[in-house]
């Protein structure tokens, strides 16, 4: 059985790890970095760039450089959070035919899972390069507060990338695995505060140890899937734009190029202010008007940044209270607080969390790598390489169906340990009703329409009977990935209908298969491109070396041969500008054929040079022999 790799598919950065013996190891990508920016760029010449190369060209290609795609995955276009992003993102977010939020890239409609798959492919390639063998299976992490649609979309992204997703696990739970695996014996209750690039989670987790087996049980989880470092960046960007407008009277929001430069500068300034008290945002030639070029130079202090984002940090505190309440615990019951996600490096975040829990958070967990390490550990558990570890996760939101009067009736409450199965008997609302519609919902609101609709299906063929008489058993079954399977059965007729919730929209099987085929075709075209580049390099080398040999041969090369070679060189040069590998190879072959006389001359010259150097060596050797002989004689006399 091959390795199951662990992937932290992050909003801002992604990370991949594997189990190396009993230790989890984070792998470095082709650029030598342990994390990869979750950025994908589609260039003008049709190339797809992922990670650092995509980030580097973002300034010159803002509309086709996609970042923070995780904020859109599994979401509807009309969602309030998506509408917020529509107005601030430099790329184009559109409504798909099924109502989902998709993207328009150079006139082509693309689904978020399709784009996230590019990042997963890079993670897969990183692992394959390290292991030297194909990788087909992965454990991928998601925010604990992701709903069913978002989890399903993440699984779809894995499939498009050519990975069988063996398990979807929650990010805070993965971080707890990374933290707890090598810690002291004994029972502990920990709080994992995970503030990443685009999402926020809090999980209360109990680690129990019985006879050497560690059980990681999630007691409660809460969060906000649209709160993260990107929002902190946006606050700082808006402040800088407003300051520049006050100073210069120019609104940079209408200039995508300037906004992309500003985004990079704001992110850099935010990071610097975690260790420094103030920083300069200095962007020369940010824009220009009739009077000439304009430069931005604005001082930002840590206090200013904190005043801009204080409400965002406070927004993360309310879910902490709810999670503790749901777990039936108080602050004093928490033994350790773990911070995960890059945004937790901000001193203000650390201070607020320490104030809430009454203790300093642990500093021995790497906030960027813990989640991927935990995913790799879970991969090890699934392959049997890691023993004596049991993971008990929970479903983050209640699941139920719509009943008479538009009410949400829960079948599975939030924070129920998964996998789980629950059945409940319902009946008809009207006399002689022959069919019922099962409308599946996820959320905590009483009114059905206020919750997330996951899908609906009909159960037909109910025998005519007075209202309230038929017995329809609805069963909810959540698997270990937190994905829901629903069935409805008429107990009288035995008729049954089943559905695996694919979200009310999401990608259907046909779309996923098409994207998988596209990804495979891209892999094939990437391979062909690589071969073309290699052939081009060989052609360039042949061009250069032949020209050099013609020069060295001088008058020794007959005029006819020289003309034929010059013609073949010119033909090869033209072929090298094209995209046809076979044409380049053919012209290289032609050049080799007409260059036979040239090769002979080159070999003769080479032989003469060698003979000349051999004579010189022989003469030197004679002189050396005399010295050696004298030296030898001296030695003998001793």
Curated annotation (Swiss-Prot):
Keywords linked to the UniProt accession: ATP-binding, Chaperone, Nucleotide-binding, Phosphoprotein, Stress response
Residue span of region Disordered: 603-638
Molecular function GO terms recorded: ATP binding; ATP-dependent protein folding chaperone; unfolded protein binding
Expression induction: By stress conditions e.g. heat shock.
Compositionally biased tracts (Low complexity): 603-620
Superkingdom to which the source organism belongs: Bacteria
SUPFAM superfamilies (UniProt xref): Actin-like ATPase domain (SSF53067), Heat shock protein 70kD (HSP70), C-terminal subdomain (SSF100934), Heat shock protein 70kD (HSP70), peptide-binding domain (SSF100920)
Modified residues (Phosphothreonine): 199
Function as written in the Swiss-Prot or TrEMBL entry: Acts as a chaperone.
Similarity annotation: Belongs to the heat shock protein 70 family.
Protein name: Chaperone protein DnaK
